[in-house]
A protein has these predicted regions:
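Membrane-embedded alpha-helical bundles of multi-pass transporters/translocases
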Residues: 1-471
């Protein structure tokens, strides 16, 4: 495979700023925007993401299969980036823009825009992440490319972390808080479009044009491929629990900092900005753990640190009015938020090779689309639960001081909800059978298979659910 220079690899990772940044911003601030800025109920705000996710359950696999089956000579992945870059930027702006509609039309508007947002994110994210499997089959280089992609995403989130301060500053300038949010996300949308187009240009010449393409998949094949792949099942379940933890943690963080710890908008922005700036430095230890030990080990260490912070800091250090304790806590636990994408997306490409042992085809689009469906379903479930909890505990967005039961509700979902999900993620990933050594053995077997030699799948029973042979 063609070697990618460091400068090109850095440019290649830029679309991660668009897709991961917007998804994280929507997960972190979407609920707050809908409840406190637009004035919708927490339950309906959660419903918006749920509807978008149900739509994703259809579109993600379709886009994955569509990109897998395109003519390799014309490009299977890159054309999606060029076509969807501008619409994605526009929809990002519209998602955080409210108009003078009556409430019923306002609800319909946000449902439609959310569907468009999820659609264009899928049309970019699935082909783009699938492309990494064609760029290289090197275990460590895939980790480095995922590191660069995550690095750019964190830069975006670090900039976006100051949204509370930006909107407060812009409010008197543009004529209101709603207009301030719209202006901020118009700028974010423009940045996303530019980053996608740069990634499109940087990836030129790196699509594999010599891949055999199967024109269609049956529903049975769509299900069989991922579900017989043991490493993929382990990482997907671990991913789901970790995304649930992320959705709960980030979704309630603004409320927790504002009401439980009595921080103002500037202090809340400061905590978020510093957290994501420090996150830039965590990408290097994560990459080191992945290449020196294994991606599974890197995941367990990162999520373990996050889990410990969720237990220790609320018990002993977080006090109302203190800014330093939450800054220290989030600066440490953000290693887990980094690993969530940095580790998992490099592992999916490894699972594609395991599938190729049986199918004889490279189906990155199918596997990445199944992973993104899992990601969005988990996020929607997390935000929906959070929205219902916010309503259940009696949250009043017009009150500067919340009731004791509301504060206890925020505390419980923040600490217990996040911690339980993290623990389940660690347990699931720790039993993943695809070690660095086993991956090397998979590559060796594939090299033999590609030259026409027979291989025994029985040697890979720990990685695949194999059909029993009839006597």
């Amino acid at each position: 495979m063609k070697r990618m220079s460091p400068a090109r690899a850095i440019a290649y990772g830029l679309p991660g700023l668009a897709t991961l940044f917007t998804f994280t911003m929507f997960t972190t601030y979407g609920l707050y925007f809908f409840t406190n800025v637009v004035g919708l109920s927490g339950s309906f705000a959660g419903l918006i993401m749920t509807i978008g996710t149900l739509w994703d359950a259809v579109t993600d696999p379709l886009v994955g299969i569509l990109s897998d089956n395109r003519d390799p000579k014309k490009g299977r992945r890159r054309p999606f980036l060029l076509t969807c870059a501008v619409p994605f930027g526009i929809v990002t702006w519209l998602l955080f823009t409210t108009w003078d509609f009556v409430e019923s039309r306002q609800k319909i508007y946000f449902i439609v825009v959310a569907l468009l947002f999820y659609t264009f994110q899928t049309l970019i994210d699935v082909p783009y992440t699938s492309l990494s499997g064609e760029v290289t089959d090197d275990y460590d280089l895939r980790s480095k490319l995922a590191t660069i992609r995550t690095f750019w995403a964190i830069i975006g989130v670090a900039i976006g972390g100051g949204i509370m301060t930006y909107t407060a500053f812009l409010e008197p300038v543009v004529g209101g808080i709603k207009q301030a949010w719209s202006v901020c996300f118009a700028l974010f949308g423009f940045i996303c479009t530019i980053s996608i187009l740069i990634g499109y240009k940087a990836s030129e010449g790196y699509e594999n044009q010599n891949i055999s393409v199967k024109k269609s998949y049956s529903i049975k094949e769509m299900i069989e491929g991922p579900f017989r792949n043991k490493p993929f099942l382990h990482l997907t379940i671990a991913f789901i629990f970790a995304i649930l933890a992320q959705a709960i943690f980030l979704g309630v963080l603004v409320y927790y900092l504002t009401y439980n710890l009595n921080l103002n908008d500037t202090q809340v922005s400061l905590v978020n900005i510093i957290m994501w700036i420090v996150a830039l430095f965590w990408v290097f230890p994560i990459d080191h753990w992945s290449t020196k030990y294994s991606k599974v080990t890197s995941w367990i260490i990162s999520m373990g640190i996050w889990l410990l912070c969720m237990i220790i800091f609320p018990l002993f250090f977080l006090k109302p009015g203190s800014t330093m304790a939450p800054i220290i806590m989030t600066s440490i636990l953000v290693v887990g938020l980094n690993a969530l994408y940095q580790v998992i997306y490099s592992m999916i490409s490894d699972c594609v090779e395991v599938d190729e042992l049986v199918s004889g085809e490279r189906r990155e689009g199918l596997f990445y689309s199944m992973a993104t469906v899992s990601q969005k379903i988990a996020a929607a479930i997390g935000v929906s639960i959070l929205g219902m909890v916010i309503d259940y505990v009696g949250y009043d967005p017009l009150a500067s001081v919340q009731s004791i039961s509301t504060l206890e509700g925020f505390q419980n979902i923040f600490v217990i909800g996040t911690s339980v999900c993290l623990l389940l993620s660690i347990i699931t990933m720790s039993t993943n059978p695809l070690t660095k050594k086993r991956y090397s053995e998979v590559l060796q077997a594939l090299q033999l298979k590609r030259t026409g030699q027979n291989i025994s799948l029985d040697e890979f029973k720990d990685l695949l659910f194999l059909k029993k042979r009839s006597m």
